[in-house]
Amino acid sequence: MPEADALVVWVSSDHLSEAVAQYGDATGGGLRAAVASGAFTGKACDVAVFPCVRADWHVSHVVCVGAGPAGDVDAERVRRLAAVGAHACRRQRAPRVAWVDAALGALHDAQRLDLLAEGIALANFDGGFYKTRDERTPFLTDITVLTSAPDADTALRRGSIVGESANAARVLINEPGNYLWPERLMEAAGTLASVPGITVEVLGPQRLKDLGMGMLLGVGQGSAHPPHMLVARYTPEGVTGGPVLGLVGKGVTFDTGGISLKPADGMDRMKDDMGGGATVTAALRTLALLKAPVRALAIVPAAENMPGSRALKPGDVLKSAAGLTVEINNTDAEGRLILGDALWYARQLGATHLVDVATLTGACIVALGKVTTGLFGTPLPWVDAIRAAAARGGEKVWPLPLFDDYKDGLKSDIADIVNSAGRPGGAITAALFLKEFAGTGPWAHLDIAGTVWAEDAKPWMPRGATGAVVRTLVELGHHPLP
């Protein structure tokens, strides 16, 4: 047993007697008493912390994390249990942790350890980086996983990389609008260039104008900070052909709604409107660090949607890089505009399979709440591949329709299409708008409006950015693209 401030053990609700036999004496009878009284039942995500009286263990505390019924444990449960245990250690101010690995559910060893490491990494995060008082809970600094599983180091490294990449996205999403604007987002995402296999290019306003990206430029014209676009490419060593996975992420660094101004209540949350951009750059970073065998690129169109004197107005008409003209009937339907130009450009750069990620519509929250990400796409095998990737990663996505009947709402009297079809079916019509610019070939849209942010703290997740769908995209890039 390594010297540690805390020993973390998982306790299934249907194996309480075994846990008491193994750890009852080491906890000075504390675990035995807690189980006997019903104070600790092994319910999923329950935590009980006891002083350790076994001097030969060199451990200060034993942290018991309830895992629920052993047969009910899935990928998301493991990640949550790991985060709950890590948060408990941080609250205990126990930076050195020894973690006892144990079989859970039907997950194989590598998957379980991968998720364990990711959950710990996600919990070892604090969004209060502008606090000046010493109120932050100490981070975990030394973690030893006690396991006999083969190739454990590989699985633990993979999970740590995924978790740390998701945390990088969470940092950007949590940033206030006065600290993060398009140029700053380019600088932050530009650090991808330090990752082996990734090259980065930043397109400024003049280059965007040369490319005819009237929608992106139009959205940002009311801001003092002009639009930019990040283009990052990952090429695996020795790979010269095959499909190219294109990841496109919405990068509205702050969204007031523009002239179609949002209500003041809740507008502060609109700093998270670049969550899609943060997500795709985090995913690309992870694919490169894990040496995924697929060529990939990440494109982030970045703009600030402000109601300045030069701002886009309802009734204006913009010309897209794809050549389509768009009548603006709602300046708060801006994300689809910048994504449209970016999707077109991704195809020009050779993307064969596209996924865009965006905090796109409140309508998706109405449809699916804040638990499930909305999924749209075509053809069906591509949608199924993304659903399978989400399932492997323990994330929830749900497909919504793209019936042509909904297109009537996008008709314009003076342009090719309008940018908003109104409230009914709003998530669907927004996705249909994007489809106009996605070209031929597989395309999917992930609407993370409800899942990008945790409004209420959970035992496994503090309030703030969540890092949603990073793992889904990473899983997608590690399997053959259909």
Where are the language model's segments positioned?
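A generic structural signal for tightly packed, nonpolar segments enriched in small/aliphatic residues
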Residues: 41, 186-482
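Short amphipathic alpha-helical segment within the helicase RecA-like ATPase core
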Residues: 1-244, 248-251
